[in-house]
Regions:
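Conserved SAM-binding loop
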Residues: 215-216
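Class I S-adenosyl-L-methionine-dependent methyltransferase module
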Residues: 66, 220-236
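Core catalytic lobe of class I
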Residues: 1-205, 210-212
Length: 236
């Protein structure tokens, strides 16, 4: 519920009970997962050495704490049988008006969803010529990440825009250079920017023309003012 100047004594604002985004009232969660399941490549069937991940794909969905159970159940209906919860820790909170009232939120949440085999996982592990792990390489990746804010070089386009730095960390962990990253709810284009900077091919879908135009003309432009072209990053 939104109130004028944030005070319920002033009555509801004109934005109360309104959709934040065009798709808020007609977003079909099950159609969304059906769409994503068709885009995601099939699980890798090749055997892997003990203690290593497969080259299977995964899907990462940012969500609120309360949405997690609903998403897990919907994902299972479309073949995403497993999940790993992810937490992102911020050193700031948008709940400034509540700072003297209660504990404020300073986290974001996501679900890593996958079908049956653990997805591709890159933690710096190196393999020698005999296929053995090189001691001292590889490190634990916790299920929580620090939320690094972007600098002024990254335009602010979407209210729910994610940090390019955070997205790059996730992309580096679950893909290799040359892999394909797809964002079905592209918004600001931050995912495409992160993928392209890491030499991954990237595709995005966005139904809002305003966000699409701004992402194309602001986010997907290099500091040299040479606009990124998707074709430049798609492997043949």
């Amino acid at each position: 519920m939104w109130y004028v100047d944030g005070d319920n004594k002033n009555g509801e604002s004109k934005l109360a009970k309104k959709a934040a985004f065009n798709s808020d009232f007609n977003f079909n969660l099950y159609e969304y997962f059906h769409f994503c399941s068709k885009m995601l490549k099939k699980d890798d069937t090749q055997p892997v050495a003990r203690g290593r991940s497969s080259n299977s794909p995964c899907m990462i969905v940012f969500c609120s704490w309360e949405q997690q159970f609903t998403l897990i159940q919907a994902a299972k209906k479309h073949g995403f049988n497993n999940h790993i919860p992810l937490v992102f820790i911020k050193n700031y909170s948008p709940q400034v008006l509540k700072a003297n009232m209660r504990v404020v939120g300073a986290t974001e949440y996501a679900l890593l969803l996958y079908r049956d085999r653990l997805p591709k996982f890159r933690n710096g592990l190196k393999i020698d010529e005999n296929g053995k792990n090189i001691p001292g390489t590889g490190h634990m990746v916790f299920n929580w990440f620090e939320w690094e804010r972007d600098g002024k070089d990254i335009p602010k386009i979407h209210p729910a825009q994610k940090s390019v730095k955070v997205l790059k960390k996730l992309i580096e962990t679950f893909t290799d250079p040359g892999d394909v990253v797809i964002d079905p709810c592209c918004g600001s284009g931050a995912t495409l920017r992160a993928a392209m900077e890491l030499k991954r091919s990237a595709f995005g879908f966005e139904i809002d023309r305003t966000f699409y135009e701004r992402a194309k003309n602001e986010m997907l432009v290099l500091p040299t003012d040479n606009q990124m072209s998707l074709e430049d990053y798609i492997e043949g």
